[in-house]
């Protein structure tokens, strides 16, 4: 079996974005900045000619998987500081009119399936949530924080003990932008 002596991944850096590597990766965009530590000693990172270069010499199976993961994280950071991430969710109810509002760092869901106690879902990081009519819009620069906030809202409206084919009430993901 022949092993690769070197795996090299390159991530292009768009204009207006500055990437620095010292112990971690810091990505500065026109408006925002993100930083993250990657504690994978086998992966060497450098910035060369408007590209982030990731290399692993004599990679093992875990190193091959990890270099792809690190590449995806860095490209998500670049996308986050340039464009940001926006997830849209739809409030669906058939039996009881549900009201959703933002209170501090959490979303409060009232009258879900006629329950008297409100359900709550926390924001993660510096994610922003807006409720407009029957739509919930989640925006932020960190894809993981936006996705986890969306998952928290969706889990807060999970129905237990009832047939989900009949009781389709909840807040569901409609689009990712």
UniProtKB/Swiss-Prot annotation:
Any Pfam family the entry gives: Ribosomal_L6
GO BP term, pick one: cytoplasmic translation
Presence of keyword RNA-binding: yes
Key words of the record: Ribonucleoprotein, Ribosomal protein, RNA-binding, rRNA-binding
Entry's Gene Ontology cellular component terms: cytosolic large ribosomal subunit
InterPro entries: Ribosomal_uL6-like, Ribosomal_uL6-like_a/b-dom_sf, Ribosomal_uL6_a/b-dom, Ribosomal_uL6_arc, Ribosomal_uL6_CS2
GO terms of molecular function: rRNA binding; structural constituent of ribosome
Signal sequence bounds: none
Subunit (UniProt): Part of the 50S ribosomal subunit.
Cited PANTHER family: 60S RIBOSOMAL PROTEIN L9, 60S/50S RIBOSOMAL PROTEIN L6/L9
Primary role: This protein binds to the 23S rRNA, and is important in its secondary structure. It is located near the subunit interface in the base of the L7/L12 stalk, and near the tRNA binding site of the peptidyltransferase center.
Family as reported in the entry's similarity comment: Belongs to the universal ribosomal protein uL6 family.
Record protein name field: Large ribosomal subunit protein uL6
Biological source species: Methanothermobacter thermautotrophicus (strain ATCC 29096 / DSM 1053 / JCM 10044 / NBRC 100330 / Delta H) (Methanobacterium thermoautotrophicum)
């Amino acid at each position: 079996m022949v092993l690769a002596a070197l795996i090299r991944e390159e991530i292009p850096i768009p204009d207006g974005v500055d990437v620095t590597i010292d112990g971690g990766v810091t990505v500065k965009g026109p408006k925002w900045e993100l930083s993250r530590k990657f504690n994978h000693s086998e992966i060497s990172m450098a910035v060369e000619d408007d590209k982030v270069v990731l290399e692993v010499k004599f990679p093992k199976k875990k190193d091959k998987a990890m270099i792809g993961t690190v590449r995806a994280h860095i490209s998500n950071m670049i996308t986050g500081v340039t464009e940001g991430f926006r997830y849209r969710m739809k409030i669906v109810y058939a039996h009881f009119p549900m009201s959703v509002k933002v209170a501090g760092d959490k979303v409060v869901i009232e009258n879900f399936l006629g329950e008297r106690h409100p359900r709550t879902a926390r924001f993660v990081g510096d994610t922003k949530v807006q409720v407009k009519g029957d739509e919930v819009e989640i925006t932020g620069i960190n894809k993981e924080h936006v996705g986890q906030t969306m998952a928290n809202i969706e889990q807060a409206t999970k129905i237990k003990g009832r047939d989900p084919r009949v009781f389709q009430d909840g807040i569901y993901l409609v689009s990712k932008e």
